[in-house]
Amino acid sequence: HNIVSEYMSTLSHMNMETIELSFFGGSFTGIPMQEQKDFLSIAKKYKESGLIQKIHLSTRPDYINEEILDNLKAYSVDVIELGVQSFAQPVLDASCRGHDTACVYESCAKIKEYGFTLGIQLMIGLPMDTWEYDIFSAREAAKIHPEIARLYPTVVIRDTGLFQLMEQGLYTPMGEKDAVER
């Protein structure tokens, strides 16, 4: 609450049409439900007071279900971005994502069915990824018609599954030049 209040005070002199309170940098709906409610209750108060116009979050496809969507709807969430990463099953498997492409399609459909704005995040350079898989994923994302689409290069973070694969010599991250060219 204090962080949001402090940040909001810096915006008073700006002429901004839409101010969003966003929960990024992780899988929001993967945290315990009570913690989600605690964060969202603060965001909802800001929205109801008119200080913000939208509540925005990112999560994983396998952290979407009807209970979660009902909760997000109750707290007036507007935008859900899914870290889809890839629509190619071999890439999801090699990256140890823990879900299949059916889960991705189902989650996207449910989010749209509930009336949320859908964002799809794709990631290039994951294990087993190829130019062809990237094009396939981009086309599949376009077929779903998300309102937001983001494309990220893979960044390996210490103490993750990708980091372990890299340490074992089983995965080599894409270099900056290749990421830009792709």
Please place each PLM-identified region on the residue numbering.
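Conserved alpha-helical substructure of the radical SAM core
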Residues: 1-22, 31-55, 66-67
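Glycine-rich beta-strand-to-loop/alpha-helix junction loops that act as flexible
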Residues: 24-27, 152
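Short, flexible loop/turn elements at secondary-structure junctions
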Residues: 27, 59-61, 86
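C-terminal scaffold of the Radical SAM
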Residues: 33, 40, 44-47, 56, ...
